[in-house]
């Protein structure tokens, strides 16, 4: 897994410098097109900016093992949407989603979220529990984060 994106070829194709974006994540579990990611430095959890795989879904995991967000990427390898969990210090204390990387737009809250996104969220949460991602994250932190 590359940095805030998945590969040098996409970085170069999009005209982005790969220097700042390499090596930020490790996949701790893969299920089909869904990758569960941990940030290598154990710091702030941000979703990758882009993906090398069209339609990829990344689930970013916080250092404490909880889900930070679920992000899907479009045919141009850029973020299509993200479904985010609330966290301490966040003004938004409920599950919500953002479409693309547009800033300044209000999030869509769970009650107004289209059913297909709710279904994706529920599928990811089920896989998270089924594969013991919380425990895998804790093991990852013991081995990799200083």
Regions found by a protein language model. Give the residues of each.
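Catalytic toxin/effector domains delivered as secreted proteins or via bacterial secretion systems
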Residues: 2-146
């Amino acid at each position: 897994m590359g940095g805030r994106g998945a590969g040098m070829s996409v970085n170069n194709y999009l005209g982005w410098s790969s220097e700042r974006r390499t090596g930020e994540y490790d996949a701790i579990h893969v299920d089909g097109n869904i990758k569960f990611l941990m940030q290598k430095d154990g710091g702030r959890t941000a979703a990758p900016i882009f993906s090398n795989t069209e339609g990829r879904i990344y689930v970013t995991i916080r250092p404490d093992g909880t889900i930070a967000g679920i992000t899907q990427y479009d045919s141009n390898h850029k973020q299509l949407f993200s479904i985010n969990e609330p966290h301490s210090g966040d003004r938004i204390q409920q599950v919500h989603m953002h479409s693309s990387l547009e800033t300044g737009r209000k999030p869509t809250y769970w009650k107004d979220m289209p059913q297909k996104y709710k279904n994706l969220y529920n599928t990811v949460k089920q896989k998270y529990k089924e594969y013991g991602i919380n425990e895998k994250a804790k093991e990852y932190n013991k081995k990799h984060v200083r």
